[in-house]
Amino acid sequence: MFEKAEDQAVPAVSFFDPALKEVRRRVFYQWSRTVSILCIFVLGVLSIFWGMQYSTESKLTELKVWVVDFDGQTDDYRTSSPLVGPAVIKKTQEFINSPDLHLGYIIKNASTFDNDPWVVRQAVYDEHAYAAVIINPNATSLLRAATTQHNASYDPTGAIQTITITARDQNTYYSYILPDLSLFQSAVLASFGPQWVQNLITNTKNLTAIPPQALNPAIGFTTIDLRPFTPAVAAPAVTIGLIYLIIIAFFNFPFLMPIHAQLIKPSPSNPPLKIPQWLIWRVCSNIAAYFFLSFFYSLVSLAFGIPFTNSPAPDTLSAENANAYGRGSFVVFWMLNWVGMAALGFPCENMAMVLGFPWSSFFLIFWVITNVATGFYAVELASVFYRWGYAWPLHRIVEALRTILFGTHSRIGVDFAVLFIWIAVSIAFFPAASSIMRWKMKRGWA
């Protein structure tokens, strides 16, 4: 029997055999069309990601840094001739007027903050500015006292505070803000030093009695990071690890769809399930699947030592890993990943039903790139075209995660609301997407 089947088999031919002429033409056409579509898609979608970083340096002024002079402006240290504050303000104005690339320095009056440096700290924590340079009320008074009273314990770094909050966006801080602030600080010290020495030479007879640190550098900066980005193992939880959240949500469909399909396939032993109830089952089972998948996804962060039991900290004090919800932070973290996975996964499932395979992989690439571009990078530094990124799921997930893990300024209510809107819209579209899939299957298109 096998020998007979082999005798009847059509013999294979070479690639350029005339018998394959029509097949070759069809294959070449389909190959060219598919590759062209892929090339156009790659050009278009990757341009979204590259465009997010295009001309970022020219938009650095969007990163606001307040410079507030309290020197000699409070009752305890009031003076008519402060030195430190005016010198810093003068150098700030030079930075603002400079054609060189720099952050968005803004000179603010102390009265705007009720002459209270702690109010400035609160404003930075509340994300009204990325950083603040505060010239302390006693900056000039302490410096002069060190020279007249020969105070050997004088600390130059007590003159000026630099307030940051790197957990807000570590990439932006480390790439742009901190390097520019370092240049600013060096410029202030280089400018103030000669001016101060000249002042001492004119008004002081015995320079040798002055503490060395009061001569040089005379003033300095204390950097206060309200919410440091630490430990390093937390980075995947708010960056690359979230890409896997999208991918896991996407592959929920091809793994579970064959299981769901058994309910609507009639057989001699069982009738098909009614379509409305089948859709309800699919939505509910997907939510349950996301529940368990997000739990094990969250367990990875717990297993590798990301803190989830630290107490919250006051907004204006520096604190590492000040978990916003104390010992309940892991549960909130898990719930956010659950809701986030649903917000990311349901659109994937809808598009998988509408587009079918392999074209649904296009949507996965688009979904990953647009979410990563607007979730991992500062939208403020991108073109106004990218403002839609504020409404994209991953941007909201990242923002809420930073609140849970580091205790940054909370907008977690808005973050969850946006994610629930994504889920609601996706579920509303779910029946239509399912109808399109079944319509295509009946015609053999899927």
Q: In which residue ranges do the predicted regions lie?
A:
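Extracytoplasmic/periplasmic domains immediately adjacent to an N-terminal transmembrane anchor
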Residues: 1-233
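Membrane-spanning alpha-helical segments of multipass transporters and channels
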Residues: 50-53, 231-446
